[in-house]
Every structure is written in C-alpha cells, then in structure tokens.
Amino acid sequence: DAVITEISDSDGRNELEVPAWDLDGRLKQSNNEWWKSLQDVFETLGVSNKKFNLRVKPNIPAAVGLGGSAAIAVSIIRCVSKHFKLDLTDPEINDLAFVCETAAHGTASGIDNTIATFGEPLVYQREPSTIIETLKFEKPVSLVIGISNTPSLTAEMVAGVRARWKENT
C-alpha cells in the first residue's frame, strides 16, 4: 500500500501523526490549511466530535510530486469511514479528498486524489465536464519514476506556473 492509516479511539484530543513526514499535532489546534481541511471533512462526515488518533505511514516521500498528500487524504478518509461504519463510496471519498487537495495546493487539478481514490491508471479530465475512465492495457506497462531528492511544494509550483501563464496570455 502507498499509505497505511491506523485509527484508535482516544479519551482526549484528536491527533494526527505522520512521522515519516515529520508531521504530528492536534487537529483542532493546527494552523496548517491541510489539517484544517481534514477537520472540515470530519465535520462533513459527522465525526468531528468523536475522539480518535490517526497514525499515517506513507510509503511515498513528501514534496516530490507523486501525490503523497492526496494519497494520505484518501487513506485517512477511508480509515475514518471504515472505523465509524460510514460506508463511503469511492466518488464520495474522491470529493472529500479533493477538498483536502485544494487546501494543500490552492488550485488542485483533481488528478492526484482521483488516482489515489480509484487506484488504477485513468484518463482524467476536470473541465469542461469531468471524465474518469479506466485505462486498460493488453500487456504490463513499465513505469520509471525519478526522484531528485530536491523537495518542492506543489502549491508553490502551481502558483509559479499560473503566474507565468497569466503573463503570457
């Protein structure tokens, strides 16, 4: 699995730990926009008053453009849905993860949360109308991913691309 999330009941405050990414803290007291969006998701799901701790174990490095924040959001939402017997569908999980991605990146494309939710190669289009189609291959396809070990935040990259696009249009 790309991300494993464990949930446990708590008698105190809600906490989120992502040790591999050096993230931990109390959900309600965080100033991080992504964590705030998780709290909004929990309110939407009706579990914000429940006491629980989340421990997330990503097998994706942070800030390398591989959709790690989306994978974590999807994993957390699935875990909470299962724990509280909410029976969320993949489209519902995808919509909620998109909320987290928008908070994390400002303007999210939707591709990362969609791939993380459905877990298979897809054709994805957000506008003018959403298209999600599974890609089928007759033979296995090799995929090579290079990681430069130079972290960069997607939100900063998106903002830079948007600024250059506006300058040239």
Which residue stretches match the model-derived regions?
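Short hydrophobic alpha-helices at membrane interfaces in multi-pass membrane enzymes
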Residues: 91-92
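Short pre-catalytic strand/loop immediately N-terminal to key active-site residues, enriched for Gly-Thr
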Residues: 52, 57-64
